[in-house]
C-alpha cells in the first residue's frame, strides 16, 4: 500500500483525552439546568406520574426538600407546575389568580427558605380550566385571545406579588407579553423577569405532562392547534420571538426541545437574546423507557441530548433529568 501524504489528519487531535478536552467547543454544567416540578395540595404526600418514571407530584413541604437538593447540586432555578383539584377548576379559571392558591403558597415557601434559588412560574390557564384549554373559550370552543390575556395578567401579577423571580407565559396568546410587562411595570414589579414561551409548538410530545398536571382528561380529544404553532413552521417562530422581545420579554423559549433544535439555533443566531429550550415530558419518557428496557445507556444518552441543546445555542434547559445530570456532573 502506497504511503499517503495527508496534510490534514483531524484524528490527531482526537487521539488523547487532553487534546480532546482542549478543543471541546461546548460544555454542559449545572448552571444550564432548570428543574420542572409538579406541586400538589396537602402535606407529606407524593404521587407518581405513571407516564414519567421517576417523576413525582409533591406537596409543598416535600418540595422544600427537593429545593434544598437543587441548591446543594448547584441548580440555579426550578419551574413550578401546579396540579389543581378538579373542584377548583372552572370555565373562567378564577383559581389561577387566587392569592391564597397553591402556586402563591409554594412561591412564598420557596423564597422564604431559599431566597437565592430562582423560582419560575407557569402563566397559563390549562391547569385551571374545566376543558383543559389554555384560555377562556367561546360557545364553539375557540379560545378567546383578549379575554384570556386579561386573566393571564392577573395571574402573572399574583405570582409576582408572591415573590416569583420569573413569570413564564406558556399560553401562546397574542399580545400577552406586552400586557404582562405593562402590568408588572405599573405595579412596580420592575425586577420580575419574563420568560416567554415564544415558539411553543402543537406537539405530540406533551402527553405525559398533561397527565402530570391533570389536564389530559379535561382536554379529551380536543387540540390546541388554533394557538400553538404548526410543527412544520420555523419562519413563523422568528416572527413570534421578535414580537415577544419587542413587547418586553427578557428570555425566550422554544418548546419542545430536541425535535426543534433548528429553531433554537435560528433564534439564537438571529436575536442573540437569552434562549431556552424545554426537554419536554415526551422526550423524557422516551429516554427513560429505552433505558429501563436496556436499549440505551441512560446517562450517556441524556448527557448527549443536553449537549445537543447547548450546541444549538440554548443558554438554559428545562429538563426532568436536571437533578440526575447535576449529580453526574459532580
PLM features: residue spans?
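N-terminal [4Fe-4S]-dependent radical SAM core
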Residues: 19
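Charged, low-hydrophobicity low-complexity segments
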Residues: 24-25
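Alpha/beta enzyme core
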Residues: 2-4, 8, 16, 28-34, ...
Amino acid at each position: 500500500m502506497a504511503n499517503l501524504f495527508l496534510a490534514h489528519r483531524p484524528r490527531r487531535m482526537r487521539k488523547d483525552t487532553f487534546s480532546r478536552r482542549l478543543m471541546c467547543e461546548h460544555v454542559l454544567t449545572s448552571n444550564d439546568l432548570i428543574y420542572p416540578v409538579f406541586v400538589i395540595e396537602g402535606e407529606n404526600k407524593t404521587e407518581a406520574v405513571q407516564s414519567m418514571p421517576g417523576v413525582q407530584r409533591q406537596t409543598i413541604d416535600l418540595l422544600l426538600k427537593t429545593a434544598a437538593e437543587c441548591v446543594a447540586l448547584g441548580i440555579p432555578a426550578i419551574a413550578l407546575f401546579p396540579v389543581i383539584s378538579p373542584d377548583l377548576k372552572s370555565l373562567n379559571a378564577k383559581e389561577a389568580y387566587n392569592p391564597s392558591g397553591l402556586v402563591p403558597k409554594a412561591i412564598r415557601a420557596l423564597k422564604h427558605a431559599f431566597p437565592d434559588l430562582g423560582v419560575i412560574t407557569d402563566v397559563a390557564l390549562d391547569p385551571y380550566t374545566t376543558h383543559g384549554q389554555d384560555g377562556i373559550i367561546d360557545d364553539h370552543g375557540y379560545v378567546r385571545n383578549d379575554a384570556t390575556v386579561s386573566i393571564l395578567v392577573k395571574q402573572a401579577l399574583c405570582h409576582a406579588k408572591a415573590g416569583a423571580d420569573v413569570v413564564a407565559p406558556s399560553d401562546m396568546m397574542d399580545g400577552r407579553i406586552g400586557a404582562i410587562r405593562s402590568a408588572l411595570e405599573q405595579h412596580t414589579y420592575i425586577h420580575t423577569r419574563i420568560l416567554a414561551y415564544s415558539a411553543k409548538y402543537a406537539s405530540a410530545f406533551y402527553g405525559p405532562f398533561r397527565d402530570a398536571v391533570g389536564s389530559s382528561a379535561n382536554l379529551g380529544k380536543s387540540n390546541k392547534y388554533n394557538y400553538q404553532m404548526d410543527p412544520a413552521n420555523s419562519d413563523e417562530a422568528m416572527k413570534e420571538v421578535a414580537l415577544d422581545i419587542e413587547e418586553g420579554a427578557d428570555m425566550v423559549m422554544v418548546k419542545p426541545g430536541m425535535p426543534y433544535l433548528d429553531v433554537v439555533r435560528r433564534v439564537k443566531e438571529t436575536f442573540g437574546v437569552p434562549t431556552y429550550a424545554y426537554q419536554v415530558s415526551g422526550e423524557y419518557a422516551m429516554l427513560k423507557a429505552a433505558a429501563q428496557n436496556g436499549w440505551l445507556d441512560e446517562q450517556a444518552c441524556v448527557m448527549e441530548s443536553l449537549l445537543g441543546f447547548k450546541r444549538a445555542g440554548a443558554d438554559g434547559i428545562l429538563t426532568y433529568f436536571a437533578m440526575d445530570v447535576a449529580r453526574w456532573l459532580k
